[in-house]
Swiss-Prot record:
Biological source species: Brucella melitensis biotype 1 (strain ATCC 23456 / CCUG 17765 / NCTC 10094 / 16M)
Keywords attached to this entry: Cell inner membrane, Cell membrane, Lipid biosynthesis, Lipid metabolism, Manganese, Membrane, Phospholipid biosynthesis, Phospholipid metabolism, Transferase, Transmembrane, Transmembrane helix
Membrane topology: Multi-pass membrane protein
Homology family: Belongs to the CDP-alcohol phosphatidyltransferase class-I family.
Keyword Manganese set for record: yes
UniProt topological domain (Periplasmic) ranges: 52-57, 113-115, 168-171, 224-230
Main location: membrane
An MF annotation (GO) of this entry: phosphatidylcholine synthase activity
Residues passing through the membrane, by range: 31-51, 58-78, 92-112, 116-136, 147-167, 172-192, 203-223, 231-251
Protein name: Phosphatidylcholine synthase
Length: 276
């Protein structure tokens, strides 16, 4: 009996020790909450699929817009909380890529096919081009440049298809846009990241926010937007589409302002370090 009791106590001690060792810390809980925020994009994607299946495209784009907002804020929060180092066994990058493929690629391709505004055949072919080319693009580990530009069209099909839904160009113009963008995914041409690219950041971010504003107005009109909205979203969209290549051709464009800002930041950090 004594031996059994000692064995039971030993097992209990080991289990208690393991449970104590696995105690969740406050930083870990905060870090995991960021992963939950990122994962919420999958539910938003589900809601957008349901809406698209019912032909409620305005609702679908609202859900995808909310998913885009979540995708825009989870990264900065994750870096601030150092999630990658606090929870090294959980890959925020992989989770983000999975949800991005669904919200940026798969659902817009489905909506393009489901709506049929390019005609049945062209819509089907366009959807196939989008999902296959994007899957290959996501496998590229060198999709970012040193300046945080995307190398090649960054498969932001949610923005492209959304613009097509609002502007409603001819079916062959829309099809040509899809084909050209898919080809550009694999060419060494820079595309803008409106937040992470330092050069011309104030201007680029302003144009991006204007594009978002025109998009919200278009959704208010249930995608049947007036001409000024269609012109606005087209002009801002074309700027976002081409400015990366223009800045690649003219590498000095906006560089002085970016360097001056970097110098001020370094000086501020140095002064902060010298403070008692």
């Amino acid at each position: 009996m004594g031996g059994q009791k000692e064995m039971a106590d030993s097992v209990k001690t080991k289990l208690t020790g393991k449970l104590k060792a696995k105690k969740v810390t406050a930083p870990q809980a905060k870090a995991f909450s960021v992963h939950l925020l990122t994962a919420s994009g999958s539910f938003l994607a589900f809601l957008s699929v349901v809406a698209a299946s019912d032909g409620r495209y305005t609702a679908m784009w609202w859900w995808l817009g909310l998913a885009l907002f979540v995708d825009g804020i989870d990264g900065p929060i994750a870096r601030k909380l150092e999630v990658k180092y606090v929870l090294p066994n959980w890959s925020g990058e992989l989770l983000d890529s999975i949800i991005d493929y669904v919200t940026y690629v798969l659902i817009p391709a489905f909506a393009l096919y489901q709506s049929g505004f390019m005609g049945t055949n062209l819509s089907f072919i366009s959807g196939a081009i989008i999902v296959v080319s994007s899957a290959i693009y996501y496998a590229d580990t060198g999709m970012k440049t040193k300046e945080n530009f995307f190398k090649g069209f960054p498969v932001v099909w949610n923005m492209v298809v959304f613009t097509l839904f609002i502007v409603r160009p001819g079916e062959w113009v829309a099809f040509g846009t899809v084909v050209a963008s898919a080809i550009l995914s694999f060419l060494p041409i820079n595309f803008l990241h409106p937040v992470r690219v330092v050069r011309l950041r104030p201007l680029n971010l302003t144009i991006f926010l204007l594009w978002c504003a025109f998009g919200v107005i278009a959704l208010y009109y249930m995608l049947d937007a007036p001409l000024w909205v269609r012109i606005g979203i087209s002009v801002t969209g074309l700027y976002i589409y081409f400015i990366g290549a223009i800045m690649q051709l003219f590498p000095s464009l906006g560089r002085e302002a970016a360097l001056a800002k970097a110098r001020k930041l370094v000086e501020k950090q140095q002064k902060s370090g010298e403070a008692p």
